[in-house]
Regions:
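Bacterial N-terminal signal peptides
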Residues: 9-19
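Bacterial N-terminal signal peptides that target proteins for export
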Residues: 1-11
Length: 315
């Protein structure tokens, strides 16, 4: 009787194991250095990795929260010269931290499906050419601070909900942040760039905040939804353009200057615009659009003209 019970338990254990029940599959990331190209690929589980450079100049890919790298807790590349880095995380709720990395050319990162996070460490990274970050479906969180990027910086949340915060970036050309039909949040703080930057969040109730920004030009387009746009201490050599689309939107400018033109278009809905110490070298144009719109003038000057139209309330 005991023998039969033992055989039955053994058979059940084998069947459960074969079905994947009672056994744990390790989160696996592969890291391969092909000449001067570092390629990191995840699986469809929740992976957490840190990509960092130590004091000797070695590049380490370290697994966290049970993630294995090449089957081990971490992998070390001895003093590599990285021309390009490609990171493909695929599905799962992934977490990527990049600390003190130097890439001579491009860094491309696709977070894949899932609720993903990309963060920078205490030591800023340097990208010689372009930084491209892509999300997919899910909640995509991007937090980068202090990086130097020689070319363009592009963050595209794809179909997910984008929560992007870029702080103290020095970008050679442009910053581009793109959301989709979700409640996106984009924050740029203390960024300097040489190109014309743009933020596009499309539908849903979005929030865009730009503070201490110096660049060639800036375009913000939030499209439909109850959107909020705030620009504070923003200076550009070229145009500043904001379009919030239909529904009830709020736009506030404080200490905003363009050496060319400023255009704000609020479109349909009961919108409001407030400006304090706002100036354009040439034209400053503000369009309220359909609805009962509010215009608060705390010092707005267009060198050639100041054109305020389709606003109904002037408190």
């Amino acid at each position: 009787m005991h023998c039969c019970r033992f055989l039955l338990n053994l058979t059940l254990f084998g069947l459960l194991g074969f079905a994947g029940i009672g056994s744990a599959k390790a989160n696996t990331v592969n890291a391969i250095l092909e000449g001067e190209l570092l390629v990191i690929t995840g699986d469809n589980l929740a992976n957490a990795i840190t990509l960092t450079t130590n004091s000797a100049g070695d590049v380490l890919v370290v697994g966290r929260n049970g993630t294995l790298v090449n089957g081990a807790p971490s992998v070390r590349f001895r003093r590599p010269v990285l021309n390009s880095v490609e990171i493909l995380m695929f599905g799962g709720n992934d977490n990527v931290l990049i600390n003190g990395l130097t890439v001579n050319n491009d860094l491309f990162l696709n977070l894949g499906d899932g609720n993903d996070t990309l963060r920078s460490g205490l030591v800023p990274s340097s990208i010689g050419a372009n930084l491209s970050v892509e999300g997919a479906s899910g909640n995509e969180i991007v937090r980068l601070a202090g990086w130097t990027i020689g070319g363009d910086c592009t963050v595209d949340g794809q179909t997910g909900t984008l929560n992007c915060e870029l702080t103290g970036l020095n970008v050679g050309f442009a910053i581009t942040a793109i959301g989709d039909e979700a409640r996106d949040v984009v924050t740029l703080a203390g960024c300097t760039m040489g190109g014309f930057s743009s933020i596009e969040t499309r539908g849903a109730n979005d929030s865009v905040t730009v503070t201490d920004f110096i660049g060639l030009g800036l375009s913000v387009n939030t499209d439909a939804g109850l959107d909020s746009v705030a620009l504070t201490r923003v200076a550009t050599l070229e145009d500043i353009y904001v379009n919030t689309g239909v529904h009830r939107d709020t736009v506030n400018f404080t200490d905003v200057n363009s050496d060319r033109n400023i255009t704000v278009s609020l479109d349909g809905g009961d919108d409001s615009f407030g400006g304090v110490n706002v100036s354009a070298q040439y034209d400053a144009v503000f369009e309220g659009g359909a609805g009962i719109d509010t215009f608060l003038d705390g010092g707005i000057i267009g060198g050639t003209k100041t054109d305020v139209k389709e606003f109904e309330i002037f408190p």
